Amino acid sequence: PGSIFFALKGENFNGNQFATQALKEGCSYAIVDEADYVTDDKRIILVDNCLSTLQALAHYHRKILGLPIIGITGTNGKTTTKELTAACLAQKFNVLATEGNLNNHIGVPLTLLKLTSSHEIAIIEMGASHPGDIKELVEITEPNYGIITNVGKAHLQGFGSFEGVLQTKCE
């Protein structure tokens, strides 16, 4: 109860297929982006793109709460830096931090949607596989502060070169 199901699509699944089941299992609403999955149930909401809608909702939620956010990125060391930063800040503040390494275009919005008015600061880990990824996550998150752990040559395939990695991490 109180949950919203977003019919996200993956390489091997189409979340739209599970919308009705999600409602049966207790979700309050199901967001779909294919008209074939809309029924007479008013709790099914048709949008142009479920992922974009999830990201927009997370951005809106972040703006409403308006608390400080620290964004963390880098070639490696993101998760450790996030955990250490969260542990230090938790000595004085009620902190929300990204769980594990859920640091992509889906994990970051889901983390932001966990923010409540009781939180005083958020630590958001941001990962990238391709140029533009960090820019997209920054637009959703609008961090007040940023930490770049380091920039290295790991995972060059998505960036083309070390310069591509550097450019992406500085987005």
Task: Cite the ranges covered by each PLM segment.
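N-terminal leader/targeting and accessory segments in enzymes
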Residues: 1-56, 60
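Phosphate-binding loop of NTP-binding sites
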Residues: 53-171
